């Protein structure tokens, strides 16, 4: 049997996929949830990206895990997940009130329609050592304090592995580590990270540490076990997901 000719420019190399995007709908939900008129779609999407960047910069140091945005016709809700909610809320809720005002000002500056009902929810992350975003910031914080990078990643990965539900972790640093003239990468890994398994609950985050001799890139993967679907209840239209015990 004659085989079809192979194209010369055919690219059979594998592609790198973000672990979060790889599990959308299966295990993860979108961080921006809304429907919009086609004419307003670009405005809303651009607004979400710019507001999220603004908040990530403004709230750096507050151990933020994620920023979620929900919109309806009359209401807009921001959900900020953090391991230290007290830093955001402040005394008698003054910090949360000020942050709410700042978000509305930013929306006005971006020419986004002011919602009739605006809500800001601050949710506590109960297991921060199992959250990749918080762990990545902890590493960046240690590096920016001029601590030895090997000690930082070794100490933190041991903390991560003792956290509830964690079965594997991987940390990669890249840049002029220790002030070296030539940039390189350093990696440390514990347990397993099954990136190709859809049911594997893998959290991932990129972060930067700004040092006097340059920027060090940080990548963190945390494997929190597999998630299996329960049997579908005929009375329920949705399928609930529960962690494998």
Write out the residue ranges for each language-model feature.
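RNA-contacting regions in translation and RNA-metabolism proteins
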Residues: 2-245
């Amino acid at each position: 049997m004659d085989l079809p000719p192979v194209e010369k420019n055919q690219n059979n190399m594998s592609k790198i996929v973000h672990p979060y995007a790889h599990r959308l709908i299966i295990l993860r939900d979108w961080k921006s949830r809304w429907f919009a008129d086609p004419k307003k779609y670009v405005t809303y999407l651009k607004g979400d990206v710019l507001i999220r960047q603004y908040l990530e910069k403004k709230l750096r140091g507050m151990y933020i895990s994620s920023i979620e945005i929900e919109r309806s016709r009359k209401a807009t809700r921001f959900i900020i997940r953090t391991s230290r909610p007290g830093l955001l809320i402040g005394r008698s809720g003054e910090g949360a009130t000020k942050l709410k005002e700042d978000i509305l000002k930013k929306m006005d500056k971006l020419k986004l329609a002011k919602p009739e009902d605006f809500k800001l929810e601050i949710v506590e992350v109960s297991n921060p050592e199992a959250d990749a975003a918080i762990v990545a910031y902890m590493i960046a914080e240690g590096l920016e304090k001029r601590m030895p990078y090997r000690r930082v990643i070794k100490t933190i990965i041991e903390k991560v592995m003792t956290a509830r539900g964690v079965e594997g972790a991987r940390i990669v640093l890249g840049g002029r580590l220790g002030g070296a003239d030539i940039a390189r990468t350093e990696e440390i890994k514990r347990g397993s990270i099954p990136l190709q398994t859809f049911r594997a609950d893998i959290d991932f985050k990129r972060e930067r540490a700004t040092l006097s001799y340059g920027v060090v890139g940080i990548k963190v993967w945390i494997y929190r076990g597999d998630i299996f679907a329960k049997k579908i209840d005929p009375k329920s239209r949705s399928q609930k997901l529960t962690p494998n015990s």
